[in-house]
UniProtKB/Swiss-Prot annotation:
Species for this entry: Aquifex aeolicus (strain VF5)
Membrane topology listed for this record: Multi-pass membrane protein
InterPro entries: DUF2227_metal-bd
Protein name (Swiss-Prot/TrEMBL): Uncharacterized protein aq_2157
GO cellular component terms attached to this protein's record: plasma membrane
Keyword Transmembrane helix attributed: yes
Predominant subcellular localization, coarse grouping: membrane
Entry superkingdom: Bacteria
Subcellular location: Cell membrane
Keywords carried by this UniProt record: Cell membrane, Membrane, Transmembrane, Transmembrane helix
Membrane-spanning residues: 7-24, 39-56, 69-91, 116-138
Amino acid sequence: MLVPQDYRIPFGIGYLLGTFFLSPDLDLHFSKPSQRWKFLKFLWFPFWVFSRHRGITHVPFLGTLVKLFYLIFIFFFLYFAVLGVLSILGFAPKELLSFDPFAFINEFLKSEKGFFFILGLIVADLLHIVLDIVSSFIKRF
């Protein structure tokens, strides 16, 4: 196998998430990957507004990175929104205040496990794109 044994789990998780939740077809609000987000589907509404089907999400590597950066942006936005609301209400727990989301994301992206997780996402997207091309070619005949 091409993935070292120590990194098969992060790669596998990335591949499964990339296949079932972060597919290039996530740019369609009615697609299966979009439906799998259930009640969190609303998080993708801005993404649907600014992307067209088979647009940037179907560009190898770039589509994966765009979705990943979008999720990171949503993570930061929600973290600071929740932190702000809890602070206003006087309920901000010390664990939440001491958590550094920038350091967390930075360490994850620099780690080998993070690399293989992202590689799993990329492989899932590449396979999806190849299957789209093959199925489109077959439909022509």
